[in-house]
Structure formats: structure tokens, C-alpha cells
UniProtKB/Swiss-Prot annotation:
Pfam families: TRAM_LAG1_CLN8. Mediates resistance to sphinganine-analog mycotoxins (SAMs) by restoring the sphingolipid biosynthesis. Could salvage the transport of GPI-anchored proteins from the endoplasmic reticulum to the Golgi apparatus in ceramides-depleted cells after SAM exposure. GO terms for molecular function: sphingosine N-acyltransferase activity. It comes from Solanum lycopersicum (Tomato). It comes from the Eukaryota. It is found in: Endoplasmic reticulum membrane. This is ASC1-like protein.
């Protein structure tokens, strides 16, 4: 049964995942650029000019290319911060009262006699997936046609594509429970990342110490993600899988999904190296940042 059916309004209703559910994904993919355009024009532009130039200097004659770039990049980070905050709240609303929020074993068993991969999803979990899937579908195109071209463009594109594939695959192969926790892990640290970047663009270096970013990145992406989430998807799931019933599809689901999850771990480590370098530079400069976060410098080929 697809998400467009009436039962979608009942968030606790359980049903098996279906390709029909993805009928709403294009709606979200169109929703995000529409909202971003309105926020860019009526909110972010004014806020950026106020914070970057100061009160009474929002309109500057003979505006330089550097100032225009700072405004554009500030608006990009403001938009991402708004999305990640909304997605984090959504993910917590969906997962907080579920048994697998605190016990990874319930990724694979329950409720009742349901055992992975024969598990149903609640409508609220399906909605979270379509919301996030729509954003990353839009983000792939935004990175090409809308965003400032940065030196880590290839890595960012790989991340967006891998995330979009993970969302589609994990949904259809019944990995959505663990997937919702992975989404919550990523969104939490990304909120602090975008706040730090906005503070850099606005010249508020004291706010750009990235202490919360570093702390959340270490705890969520470098400790909890590999030692709890990946441990559960690599080992714990094997203890519950009916190997006789799922001789073919079980191993296929297992290896494909875990390969993508480990690719995300590699990206976590890569970005942590960049964040760590920035942290060291900030300490040496006594709180001042000479560069930006996570390879945020412009591509040398940008006009």
C-alpha cells in the first residue's frame, strides 16, 4: 500500500514497504527548492547582509566579488542548517519511542514475531524516508547547478549519491530502522557544521570554535556509528536472520548495504581529518579561522 493511501495519515499504521511509496518522493524533491528559493529571497539574504555588513550597511555600493561570495555561501549554510534541524527533529519524533532507539537488537526483531527481512514499517518511518530521500535527490542537482563549487565537490557528490542510494536500498530491503538512526546521527553533527560555517562567513570567529561540531562528530560518527550501528549491521543481524529461508536475498542485502555503510565511514574519517586540521589552525591562531570548514574553499576554476 502506497503512502498516498488514506492510512498515511495514521502514523502508527504498519505495512510492508512498496515501490509505490516512492510516488511522493518527487513531490518532496520539488518542495525543497521551492522553499529554499523563498527563504533565500525573503529571509536569508537580509539576515546575511545584516550579520556580514552590520546594521545600517545592508546595502553596499560597489559590492565586491568577495562579499557576494560570502553572502551566497552564508545563504547556502543557512538553508542546510534549517533542513538538518527539521530532519533531526523529524527523525527523533519517529524513533525516540521505538525499542530500537536504545537497543540495536530491535533493528532486526519485533514487534511480535517479525524478524528481518520480514518486517513492516510504520507510516511515520516511511514519511521520514520520503522526506530525506526527496532532499538528497534535490541536493544532487543543487550541487551541480545551484551550490558554490568547492574543492571537495567530488567527495560531496559521492556522499549525496551514496546517501540517495542507501535511502532507496535500505527502504526496500527492510533496513529502514537502522537507516533512520543513521540519518539522525548525520543530521545532528551537520547542524553544528553549518552553524560554524555561518559564523565564519559573518566574521563571528568566537562562535566558530567548532567545539560542539568536533564533540558530536567524534561521539556520533566515529564512535557510535562504527561500534554500535556497523557492529549491529555486520554481526547482530546474522544472529536473527533465517539463513534457510533467505539463502539468496539475505546475503545480497547484507553485503550491498554494509558496503555502502562502510563507504560512509570512510567519508566520516576523511571529513574528520579536515575538521581536525581546521581545529588545530584555530587553536594556533587563538580562535581566528584562516580557512573554512570541510574544504569549503572555492574551486580555482570558479568564475
Amino acid at each position: 500500500m502506497g503512502l498516498l493511501e488514506g492510512t498515511f495519515l495514521d502514523w502508527e499504521y504498519e505495512s510492508y514497504p512498496s515501490y509505490e511509496d516512492f510516488a511522493v518522493l518527487p513531490l518532496f524533491a520539488l518542495f525543497f527548492p521551492s522553499v529554499r528559493f523563498l527563504l533565500d529571497r525573503f529571509v536569508f539574504e537580509k539576515v546575511a547582509r545584516r550579520l556580514i555588513f552590520g546594521k545600517g550597511q545592508e546595502v553596499v555600493e560597489n559590492e565586491t566579488d568577495d562579499r557576494r561570495r560570502r553572502i551566497r555561501k552564508f545563504k547556502e549554510s543557512a538553508w542546510k542548517c534549517i533542513y538538518f534541524l527539521s530532519a533531526e527533529v523529524f527523525a527523533l519524533v519517529v524513533t525516540y519511542n521505538e525499542p530500537w532507539f536504545t537497543n540495536t537488537r530491535y533493528f532486526w526483531v519485533g514487534p511480535g514475531d517479525q524478524v528481518w527481512p520480514d518486517q513492516m514499517y510504520k507510516s511515520k518511518l516511511k514519511a521520514l524516508y520520503m522526506y530525506t530521500g526527496g532532499f538528497y535527490t534535490y541536493s544532487i542537482f543543487a550541487l551541480i547547478f545551484w551550490e558554490t563549487r568547492r574543492s571537495d565537490f567530488g567527495v560531496s557528490m559521492s556522499h549525496h549519491v551514496a546517501t540517495a542510494i542507501l535511502i532507496v536500498l535500505s527502504y526496500n530491503i527492510r533496513f529502514a530502522r537502522v537507516g533512520s538512526v543513521v540519518l539522525a546521527i548525520h543530521d545532528a553533527s551537520d547542524i553544528f557544521l553549518e552553524i560554524g560555517k555561518m559564523s565564519k562567513y559573518s566574521g563571528a570567529e568566537a562562535l566558530a570554535s567548532f567545539r560542539y561540531l568536533c564533540l558530536s562528530w567524534i561521539i556520533l560518527r566515529l564512535i557510535y556509528y562504527p561500534f554500535w550501528v556497523l557492529w549491529s549491521t555486520s554481526y547482530e543481524v546474522l544472529q536473527t536472520l533465517d539463513k534457510e529461508k533467505h539463502k539468496v536475498d539475505g546475503p545480497i542485502y547484507y553485503y550491498i548495504f554494509n558496503s555502502l555503510l562502510f563507504c560512509l565511514l570512510v567519508l566520516h574519517i576523511y571529513w574528520w581529518v579536515l575538521i581536525y586540521r581546521m581545529l588545530v589552525k584555530q587553536i594556533q591562531a587563538r580562535g581566528q579561522l584562516s580557512d573554512d570548514v570541510r574544504s569549503d574553499s572555492e574551486d580555482e576554476h570558479e568564475d
